[in-house]
Amino acid sequence: MNEDPAQQAMKVLAKYPLCDRCLGRLFAGLGRGLSNAERGRALKLSVVMSLHAMSLSGRLPENARDVLANAGGAAAQVYVELFGSPPEHRSCYICNDALDKFLDEMPQRVADAVKEWGGSTFLVGAKVDPGVIAREERIKAEFGLAFGESIKSEIKRELGKRAQQLGPKVSFDRPDVVVMVSFPDGSVSVQPRRLVVKGLYRRLRRDLQLRPREALSHPLVARLINDTRSSRVGIVGLVRDEKEVRALGLGIPVEFHLGGPRVRLVPPDGSIIEAEGASLEVNSSVEASGPEDLSRRVRVYRCVLYVEGGAFESLQLAAASLRGKEVRQKFMGKEVSGVVRGAECVDMGGGLAECIIALDERLHVMELVSGSGTEPSLSGLLGTAAECVVADLLGVIPLR
């Protein structure tokens, strides 16, 4: 539409009372460096001046009284001059005169919410009453206004800009918290971004298994939850923490994804978080892998084996024949396969041997030794029973 914006504004004001901000927002795409309130005020002044000029030339239009009354304070003096008394106040058709006050009061609440949740960066989201949106869209459609923006967009922009002046910084990519505000009721809710703590997991106790589904009861997880004041946790990279197997040496690369944190301070690299025999060495460069990456990670174990008959030479031969072989296992109803990457044994006497065994992460070392659901296995190749008396995980490393 080629009609002058002031002429369009006059037509809108002939029917609908609007505050400066809601009128200006209907023309938000026109002009630069203006707030919607400034834009609306300028349009109203242009309309008032045009009507005043018309009245002085004796050609005041019939709808002038409604236009001036709906323009509010910007037209008050001209209205009195033309009609002899001040106009009755008419509330904004779109926001019911609530938007300016909302934008003045909410920035502090947004900034306080960011601080309360331990954030330094934020993003504002907005929920607007459907009735408000419908009234705004009705005017745009009725008058063919093509340069407006939504009230939701204005609320997010204005609150973000004003709250940022109070301390926290806006981040569009990875905000610590998203602060959702509701207009016009003023309710606030916070959606904190999960906090990720990366590192190397170790445990010295054999009886302190970390099960992801029961993670909240584990002392190390409980400490992380307490330190960050989080409400939930997800663990990436801990494919399994085997019963009775200590995790030593290089440890297991893991990520703890802490949900709902109110403290967002991640301990510096090299820090050790300990709890009852379990620890996490914080390392932000750790790349934890999920179940889909099992074929690309290798578990290295130190195992003490007992072989019936004490035939150490036979054990050496069996271990050597396993190296580089693909092994199939049935474990808890699932079939898996992987490669034994290395197996070296040292005789300890008395039928015992210390072995270093490296195998793809999807394989289970206890079953590889005993032969339970496994083909080939050490026991199978020996032709006699072999048992893993004790085992320690020395590390989980990427396959090279």
From Swiss-Prot:
Keywords per UniProt: Isomerase, RNA-binding, tRNA processing
Superkingdom: Archaea
Keyword RNA-binding included in the entry's annotation: yes
Record family assignment: Belongs to the pseudouridine synthase Pus10 family.
Catalytic activity: uridine(54) in tRNA = pseudouridine(54) in tRNA; uridine(55) in tRNA = pseudouridine(55) in tRNA
Organism: Acidilobus saccharovorans (strain DSM 16705 / JCM 18335 / VKM B-2471 / 345-15)
The protein's name in its UniProt record: tRNA pseudouridine synthase Pus10
Chain sites annotated for binding substrate: 301
GO terms under biological process: tRNA pseudouridine synthesis
Annotated InterPro entries: Pus10 (IPR005912), Pus10_THUMP_arc (IPR055174)
Residue ranges of every copy of the THUMP domain listed in the record: 77-194
Enzyme class, broadest EC rank: isomerase
One Gene Ontology MF term: tRNA binding
This enzyme's EC code(s): 5.4.99.25
Function as written in the Swiss-Prot or TrEMBL entry: Responsible for synthesis of pseudouridine from uracil-54 and uracil-55 in the psi GC loop of transfer RNAs.
